[in-house]
Amino acid sequence: MTESVLDYMTRLGRAAREASRVIGRASTAQKNRALLAAANALDAARAELAAANEQDLATGRANGLEPALLERLELTPARIDGMIVGLRQVAALPDPVGAIRDMSFRPSGIQVGKMRVPLGVIGIIYESRPNVTIDAASLCLKSGNATILRGGSEAIHSNRAIAACIQRGLAAAELPAAVVQVVETTDRAAVGALITMPEYVDVIVPRGGRGLIERISRDARVPVIKHLDGICHVYVSEHADLPKAQRIAFNAKTYRYGICGAMETLLVDQRVAKDFLPSMAKQFREKGVELRGCERTRAIIEAVAATEEDWSTEYLAPILSIRVVDGLDQAIEHINHFGSHHTDSIVSENLADTRQFVAQVDSASVMINTPTCFADGFEYGLGAEIGISTDKLHARGPVGLEGLTCEKYIVVGDGQLRGQATV
């Protein structure tokens, strides 16, 4: 009899729960051995990876997959190199598991502190990029978690080939195969099962489009680490160094249009707008960026009229909204109202400006004199990231190794009794 999707996912969940107890107590050396062996396996399997990826690309082309999605799907030699380097970098990172902090004596004589421990089993749901398989697996493994990976159906062959390399790494370190499992079925019911198994899965991390993340947030019976949009702003204040501001704004938008840390709205103080916007607009136009501006912006430069919807749109494309604001207070008000609480930056040489901006902007990352595209786990020194969270509970901002752990209290005594004198 054919196994149902629910039975299949339950089997994966049960195996992951059992494996989580093993990986949770594995030594740092054992986890690093698995990561380094997986890196070597990837290096040795380049031909197999390329062949599997070509199957996915051919299917994608035949099904009319958009060029942008095909580009994300492709495993170029450089991307395989990046996956190998990523595994080795994660192996080199400090292991957060078991770290104890804030041990202190209480008046009763007991000592109280906190220890970092793995979350347990993490479900990762993502779309077309097969390199996410390595990012997710490596971070979960190093942080002592078992993981169930459900990639997009368009990358199924690539993900299977990558998973085979991870399995070789686990075997080399004598760790259970179920520490990292890739969902083999492309049936969408697998996602519904994965997000409703709290007895087996401790947290879900979705990486993909807004529709996917909204569905998971709505239907999950498991905690979710997520962000919906990356509506990021750069505010050029009246105290900005304008040449520096132009470099920052240009990099924030054009470094990569498709990342969640790309600037989508440029806010400019009215006192510097006439000096700043003409040369800024010229540079953006030469790069092919479409400009959409408010009335005050369009009185200074040529731009398409911005609508109310533009202020809350994540373009992920060479399109930029520009608004001239009265000053710092209005810039902060705009960001907190229209933004997605992801990453926002101020360009200013005035300390009072920057302090107010950092204190009042309600975002996971708040930046000073630097482009928003720096919102990245690698740039923050976290190594690879499993995603960026705009939630306020548990993890916020780029989620690296520490974000995949939690803390438990450690209490040490020497015979003290509550409410009684120690004998």
Swiss-Prot record:
Pathway noted in the entry: Amino-acid biosynthesis; L-proline biosynthesis; L-glutamate 5-semialdehyde from L-glutamate: step 2/2
Known catalytic reactions: L-glutamate 5-semialdehyde + phosphate + NADP(+) = L-glutamyl 5-phosphate + NADPH + H(+)
Enzyme class: oxidoreductase
Keyword Lipid metabolism belongs to the record: no
GO MF, any single term: NADP binding
Family annotation (Pfam families): Aldedh
Assigned EC number: 1.2.1.41
CDD domains named among the record's database cross-references: ALDH_F18-19_ProA-GPR (cd07079)
Its job: Catalyzes the NADPH-dependent reduction of L-glutamate 5-phosphate into L-glutamate 5-semialdehyde and phosphate. The product spontaneously undergoes cyclization to form 1-pyrroline-5-carboxylate.
Official protein name in the record: Gamma-glutamyl phosphate reductase
Gene behind this protein: proA
